[in-house]
Amino acid sequence: MRAVLDACGLPLAAPSANPSGKVSPTRAAHVRAGLAGRIEAIVDGGACAVGVESTILGLDGAAALLRPGGVAVEAVEAVLGVTLVAGGSASKPTAPGQLASHYAPGAAVRLDVVVPAADEVFVGFGACPGAALSLSEAGDVVEAAARLFHVLREADQIAGPGGRIAFAPVPEAGLGRAVNDRLRRAAAPRG
């Protein structure tokens, strides 16, 4: 991507590389699967290092967190020297990714599962014997954020049509807040 920007010599803006409401792409193959036949080319810079999208703030009053993302809330608060207030809502979104149901796979998603049902694809975090997949076997929220959408897509493929996915609990600290935000939206009822 750096080579494309250097060759362009101008500022470059591009739309999101995924259909609205679907699981975000973090690899070129994800973009190809989601936008096949609708785009001319894909610039493949490798897997996204951060995984979850950007942190979005509202600064038109008290500093507000509109969407937790790849920069932990604690880091933003340390730089700004203030505690962020909650901002935005699913009923009146003011930033991307605020709809109640978003980042949704085809399979139903259940959260904070310790003992999965026999018909669920179990996605672990930390030590989770029997998990089909893991956001981070080491229990690292940074790794979980980087792997989230790729693992969600894999679990959806394994679950198949009408299937179910169960996610082990992920701590809310650091990037865990962004991971849990995306998981709650993936698990929300779809309208």
Identify the function of each model-found stretch.
Residues 1-191:
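Active-site-adjacent structural elements in enzyme catalytic cores
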